[in-house]
Amino acid sequence: MSIRRDYLLRMIEQAARMLARVRELLVAGKTAEARAELERAAREAGLDLGIVLSLTPESLLPLLTNAGETDRPKCALFAELLYLERQRAIADGDTARAQRCAERAHFLFTLAYEGTTVDEETQDKISELL
């Protein structure tokens, strides 16, 4: 296995662990900790959640491209982060933020999976955001 492939697999595993941890925190009602984890993960992936939410989709798009191509894995990661941030905002009663998260997550899921077959779990998330 190549070094690049090993690195990518480690990054995927790390992201999966982080998403699972955030879900656990949300189930436990630890929304402040979940928010901190989400914000940390977003920064480590190269963008601040606040920026992702405040920019228009058109302004955000250049930050989600690599060599002129949509960075689908990055879009998928940020869609998942915003999906979980939406759940956190709902739990905290912040309906305005939850709505912004839903709109932006839907946009990012669309960018990430446009023209591809989407697994059932992801399709359920996308449908929930509409």
What residues fall within each predicted segment?
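N-terminal alpha-helical interaction modules that lie
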Residues: 1-75, 103, 107-111, 128-130
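Short, solvent-exposed secondary-structure capping/transition elements
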Residues: 27-31, 89-95, 118
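Glycine-centered coil turns and helix-coil junctions that link the paired helices
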Residues: 48, 85-88, 92, 111-115
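Conserved small-residue packing positions in alpha-helical repeats and bundles
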Residues: 15, 22, 79-87, 93, ...
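Amphipathic alpha-helical binding modules
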Residues: 94-130
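Small-side-chain structural scaffolding
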Residues: 34, 41, 79, 86-89, ...
